[in-house]
């Protein structure tokens, strides 16, 4: 039965997928990206090298993807010139490597798609055929965000690691006995030495670097309590880029000033504790970070910059420091880590990760000892080897 999967291609995974919304790398700024992300139901937006406001025959190419977490990391690093950083080209938010987003044809086989994901791709861009489309402007005319439509009417969607895992779950019986086997027996656990982790008391600079690294590999930052010679004894929680995507740009001030433990508390739930809000403000003042201070206090920056006359007219407004109303409504997540143990079955971990919309799960022993992490890529490697042996 597993051999029947060889007949599927990525077009089978595109059914029901909405066309991508995009930003132009040549005409969009970081500020545009913030407005677009706040008004979008999507966590990520694609960035392209063609300007969809112009009617030309230039071949479109997706350069990468961005989220609010990318914005927050960018602003927290450039804290001396935060307001200027908002006017930078959106391209500064893109990762240095272009290989994480790849164009493929609809005829690309499922096996080929899995191989690309294993080699490092995070999203596969696939052309889709839809009815003729008339581009509609955003309510904010200063933001150039459209559904990706080329001059020949071509539009695109993308396939993620999660899409492939969900598709394989529909054929899980074909991989017997793998689904019932434990993580330890399958050897898919990444040790603590290979995961992105920081100590609970780590400084803000260490946190910024760790979050950036986790973004690049599409995982998360483990917050640990180190004891003795082993700095990664127990897992306390995580700082997830997916949690940061629920925040707004003012969270950059918290990332730039708080320790790992305090940042976990700040982004946990809907509203940060007032005590932490005051700590962030005090540290911004102590360090003379005027740019971040101005950003931190601009709670209505999006509504104001967009020129809306009232809160009712604005598609998104900020309800509290660091938290976006639309984002928290569609993906409210606490910083509590998603965990399993080495004896958890492969299928249980897959379902757990998919249910929480993450690409990984932390692995912890029953006594609380931190073991490591298992990712969707690790799981896909197991399935790929199984299919290879069956071919």
UniProtKB/Swiss-Prot annotation:
Keywords from the UniProt entry: CBS domain, Repeat
BP terms from Gene Ontology: cellular response to hypoxia
Gene3D superfamilies according to UniProt: CBS-domain
InterPro entries: AMPK_gamma/SDS23_families (IPR050511), CBS_dom (IPR000644), CBS_dom_sf (IPR046342)
Annotated signal sequence range: none
Domain spans labelled CBS: 16-81, 331-391
Coiled-coil positions: none
Gene name as annotated: CBSX5
Highest taxon listed in the record's lineage: Eukaryota
Organism of origin: Arabidopsis thaliana
Name of this chain's protein: CBS domain-containing protein CBSX5
Keyword flag Amino-acid biosynthesis: no
């Amino acid at each position: 039965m597993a051999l029947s999967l060889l007949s599927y291609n990525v077009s089978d995974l595109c059914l029901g997928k909405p066309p991508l919304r995009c930003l132009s790398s040549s005409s969009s700024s970081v500020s545009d990206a913030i407005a677009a992300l706040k008004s979008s139901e999507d966590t990520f937006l694609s960035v392209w090298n063609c300007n969809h406001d112009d009617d030309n025959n230039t071949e479109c190419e997706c350069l990468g993807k961005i989220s609010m977490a990318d914005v927050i990391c960018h602003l927290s690093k450039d804290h001396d010139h935060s307001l200027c950083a908002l006017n930078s080209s959106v391209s500064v938010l893109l990762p240095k490597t272009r290989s994480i987003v790849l164009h493929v044809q609809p005829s690309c086989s499922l096996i080929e798609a899995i191989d690309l994901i294993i080699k490092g791709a995070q999203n596969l861009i696939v052309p889709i055929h839809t009815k003729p489309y008339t581009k509609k402007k955003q309510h904010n005319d200063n933001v150039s965000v459209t559904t990706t439509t080329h001059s020949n009417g071509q539009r695109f969607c993308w396939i993620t690691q999660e899409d492939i895992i969900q598709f394989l779950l529909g054929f899980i019986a074909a991989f017997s006995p793998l689904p019932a086997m434990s993580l330890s027996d399958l050897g898919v656990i990444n040790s603590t030495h290979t995961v992105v982790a920081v100590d609970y008391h780590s400084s803000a600079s260490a946190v910024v670097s760790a979050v950036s690294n986790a973004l690049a590999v599409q995982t998360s930052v483990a917050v640990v309590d180190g004891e003795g010679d082993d700095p990664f004894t127990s897992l306390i929680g995580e700082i997830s880029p997916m949690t940061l995507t629920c925040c707004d740009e003012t969270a950059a001030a918290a990332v730039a000033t708080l320790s790992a433990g305090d940042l976990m508390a700040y982004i946990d739930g809907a509203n940060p504790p007032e005590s932490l809000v005051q700590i962030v403000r005090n540290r911004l003042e102590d360090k003379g970070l005027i740019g971040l201070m101005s950003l931190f206090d601009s709670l209505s920056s999006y509504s104001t910059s967009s020129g809306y006359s009232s809160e009712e007219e604005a598609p998104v407004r900020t309800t509290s420091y660091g938290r976006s109303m639309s984002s928290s409504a569609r993906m409210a997540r606490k910083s509590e880590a998603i965990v399993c143990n080495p004896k958890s079955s492969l299928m249980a971990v897959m379902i757990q990760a998919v249910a929480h919309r993450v690409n990984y799960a932390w692995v912890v022993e029953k006594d609380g000892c931190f073991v490591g992490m298992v990712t969707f890529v690790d799981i896909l490697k197991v399935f790929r080897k199984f299919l290879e042996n069956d071919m």
